[in-house]
Structures are given as C-alpha cells and as structure tokens.
From Swiss-Prot:
Its EC number is 7.1.1.-. The lineage of its organism: Bacteria, Pseudomonadati, Pseudomonadota, Alphaproteobacteria, Rhodobacterales. It is found in: Cell inner membrane. Belongs to the complex I 24 kDa subunit family. The gene is nqo2. Changing residue 141 to A/S: Alters UV-visible and EPR spectra. Its cofactor is [2Fe-2S] cluster. The keyword NAD applies. This is NADH-quinone oxidoreductase chain 2. It catalyses: a quinone + NADH + 5 H(+)(in) = a quinol + NAD(+) + 4 H(+)(out). Its main location: membrane.
C-alpha cells in the first residue's frame, strides 16, 4: 500500500524540553556513531506529542539523529503505526479487520465508525475530534472483535458497545480499556476450566491495571508523564 504525507502540513515542529531530553536519553542506548538506530522511538515520541507525524516532525527527528531526511521518511512510511495525516483530537480508532475479528463482526464496527465519525478512513469527523481506520491483526484474537483506541485495546465489542464508547469519549470520559463484556483478560467466555480454584482477586489484567494506574491512555505525551530513566548508563558511569 502506497503511503504519502498529508498535503496539509504545519510550518514547524520541535520537541518540548522534556521530550527532547527523553529522545536524547534514547540515543544513549546505542554506540557512538549509531544514534540513527533510535529513529523508531524518536519518531514515535514525535507522534505522541502531536498525534501524527508531519513532514517537519520527520525532518526534525532526522536532524536530531544526524541522518538524511529520506532515511527517516522511509521508516515513517514503512510502518503503519505512524500516522501520516492529522488524527482526531480526542481519539483515533483502529478497528482490527483481520480474519478472527472480521468473522466476529468487525465489518459492523467499521459501519459504526462510518456513521458516527466519517464515511472514509483517515478522515476527520466534522468537529475534528475523531478519526478511524481499519488495521491488520492487533493480537487479541480471543477477544474479537476489538479496536485499539489511542494506546489501549477495547475488546469483545459489539455495535452498541463501540457506539457507546465513542459517545463517552466525546463526553470527555476515558472508558476502562480491556474486555467490554466482563471477561477477565482472555479467559474462556464460560470461565476457566483449569486452575479454577485459583483466586487472583484482580479486577483487571496487568495491562489494563497499568493503564489505569498511569493515567496514560489516549492523551498526548508532553514529556512529563513518563520518567526519563537510563539504567543502561549505570554500569558505564560506575553508578
């Protein structure tokens, strides 16, 4: 699939001071002269800051890493996780359309997106707050059909559940991610058939619990949310 940059581009891009510090910390993971190896996390951080990857953002990251613009552009256009056009200011919804989800109703979820957001993928809703696209397998096949919204998975969806999620996002809420039908993690719908007497007591699986604890879900990253740690420097610095 041919991927092109959006014809709508901002005049410039630069990291916030905190995100610039974060990006430079990523560069220290690699030997001197190999800083270009940090291109994926640095591009990802730029996308988290702005919501999508503009040409100025790609070129800024290339300059930061000392690499030709075309090399950074090759990476940005190769990986579908990079959004090359503006996305909804509240949420970008990615509907899994691969086999299991398709069999379980992904086409119906896509119809909801067309009706409530925009008729075409990657187009913004009338108020600019939402966008959507169909993507390949997101790896939650047991809990099909599902969607990724921001950083989180919303699983075991129905037409009604997805429509309600969109309405809640529009109202300023951030619904709890994970299964939307009461299932714990990826257990069988009828409940566990082995180790049935093992009572964990957790309300959510580890990834959902972490998302709730950090409060880092669909919001943009300004650099203050995630601590900058460089444990790989401890040994070489003698700390």
């Amino acid at each position: 699939m041919l991927r092109r940059l959006s014809p709508i581009q901002p005049d410039s891009f630069e990291f916030t001071p905190a995100n610039l510090e974060w990006a430079r910390a990523q560069m220290t993971k690699y030997p001197e002269g190999r800083q270009q190896s940090a291109i994926i996390p640095v591009l990802w951080r730029a996308q988290e800051q702005e919501g999508w990857l503009s040409r100025p953002a790609i070129e800024y990251c290339a300059d930061l890493l000392g690499m030709p613009y075309i090399r950074a552009l090759e990476v940005a256009t190769f990986y579908f996780m990079f959004q090359l056009q503006p996305v909804g200011s509240v949420a970008h919804i990615q509907i899994c359309g691969t086999t299991t989800c398709m069999i379980c109703g992904a086409e119906d979820l896509i119809r909801v997106c067309k009706e409530k957001i925009a008729p075409e993928p990657h187009a913004l809703s009338a108020d600019g707050r939402f966008s959507w696209e169909e993507v390949e397998c997101l790896g939650a096949c047991t809990n099909a059909p599902m969607a990724q919204i921001g950083k989180d998975f919303y699983e075991d969806l129905t037409v009604e559940k997805l429509a309600a999620l969109i309405d809640r996002f529009a109202a300023g809420e951030v619904p709890v991610p994970g299964p939307q039908n009461g299932r714990f993690s990826a257990e069988a719908l009828g409940g566990p058939t082995a180790l049935a007497d093992l009572k964990g007591g957790e309300a959510h699986n580890a990834s959902v619990a972490r998302a709730l604890r950090l409060g880092d879900s669909i919001k943009r990253i300004d650099g203050t949310e995630v601590p900058i740690t460089t444990p790989w420097l401890a040994t070489q610095n003698g700390v």
